[in-house]
Amino acid sequence: MNQTTTLSTELTELGVRVQNRWLQSLLDYLAKKHSTGANTTPQLVMQYLVASDIRESTTSEGAAPYIVSEQHNVRIENTMLLQIVRVREIGISIVNQLEYLNDLEELKKLKGQKVIRLVHDESGDEEQNDDDGLTEAQDAVQKGSELKKMCRLILEDSNGQRFWGLERKPIKGIQLSTKLGTKLLVKNVLVRRGVLMLDPNNTTILGGSIEEWDKDYFPKRLIEELKGELSKTKA
């Protein structure tokens, strides 16, 4: 049994079904760049897999077995590997979310200003005690650090089918700041009115992201999306 077949079998046991072509390309890359091809483990492959687009790296065997949006009171027992396209907090008003996200964006800017000022101080410039509101911004963000009630997700499988998932109970690792492209393993999940009912017992967060999707998304692009959604509700 060659290395590709061995790794593919081991990954399948973990609930992940990779495309042989993608796996072989990864092994060739590792052998050439890092000289680790002979010692490649399933855990190492997973590090690259969670950073990939599962439409390109995994097979349809790990996808939803039918059109999810058309199902009701159906349980999907097999393991699905999915990636997060969007996260929405539906237990907190959009207005409150925007207040929190704007405070967070302001904090990022103030931290940048603070770093620049410290560089100037080390250069011999006069030190200033005013933190330009950094403390106030930190306090504001800290108050919103538990900005989590119930999340609704847009999920995608290896066939490119997209559908909703809803937290029935809080799942650690799912919140507004979750990276787009984060991978999940979902097993034995109930579908109600076309929505996956997610909880910690049927959902495992693998992590990762898709760089193209996630770049500059949180909080900058998320703020713009929420503003657009808010304006539609007022129209």
UniProtKB/Swiss-Prot annotation:
Record SMART domains: DUF1767 (SM01161)
Localization, UniProt: Cytoplasm; Nucleus
Superkingdom, taxonomy of origin: Eukaryota
Biological-process GO terms, alphabetical: cell division; double-strand break repair via homologous recombination; meiotic cell cycle
Keyword Transmembrane included in the entry's annotation: no
Entry keyword annotation includes DNA-binding: yes
GO cellular component: cytoplasm; nucleus; RecQ family helicase-topoisomerase III complex
Keyword tags: Cell cycle, Cell division, Cytoplasm, DNA damage, DNA-binding, Meiosis, Nucleus
Family label: Belongs to the RMI1 family.
Protein name: RecQ-mediated genome instability protein 1
Lineage of source species: Eukaryota, Fungi, Dikarya, Ascomycota, Taphrinomycotina
